[in-house]
């Protein structure tokens, strides 16, 4: 097995673990303004950005959202929130390599862009009549802010203990 295959296998294994963590973590949720706010998904988005990059992060967010929906423990609103946030924080980490900016990008990407993207999903795919275009921004922001703070704290602790040293290369 060559190095490229080993790296791909390692990334796939990490993606599987992060997807499982996001699905299991979705059981820890708080209902806020008609949506399930699960901060663990947003923590996973930041972990994926740091360890794997934006495209893997989007894939993890999609798979976790799909699995949660198939298990009946999620809603279609999980897709725009988690995937937009994963893209934003993944791109910011790739460009800056700064954890603080990555966490801010996750919070703003999910809270604002994901919240806005959730409106047409709710209206067109779920048949809901949301009160306004920005109705999902506050609950999404509450969830993503909490998850981003958790990710920041945990990654700083892991960084000091050198847990993610090999994964960040």
Q: Predicted regions span which residues?
A:
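Loop-helix junctions at membrane interfaces
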Residues: 1-169
């Amino acid at each position: 097995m060559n190095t490229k295959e080993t790296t791909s296998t390692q990334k796939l294994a990490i993606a599987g673990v992060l997807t499982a963590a996001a699905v299991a973590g979705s059981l820890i949720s708080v209902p806020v303004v008609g949506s399930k706010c699960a901060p663990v998904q947003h923590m996973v988005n930041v972990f994926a950005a740091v360890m794997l990059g934006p495209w893997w992060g989007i894939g993890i967010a999609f798979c976790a959202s799909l699995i949660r929906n198939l298990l009946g423990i999620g809603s279609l609103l999980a897709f725009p929130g988690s995937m937009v946030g994963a893209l934003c924080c993944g791109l910011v980490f790739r460009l800056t390599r700064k954890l603080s900016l990555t966490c801010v990008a996750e919070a703003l990407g999910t809270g604002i862009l994901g919240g806005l993207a959730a409106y047409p999903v709710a209206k067109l795919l779920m048949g809901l009549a949301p009160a306004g275009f920005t109705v999902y921004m506050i609950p999404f922001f509450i969830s993503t802010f909490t998850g981003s703070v958790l990710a920041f704290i945990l990654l700083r602790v892991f960084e000091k203990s050198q847990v993610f040293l090999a994964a960040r290369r």
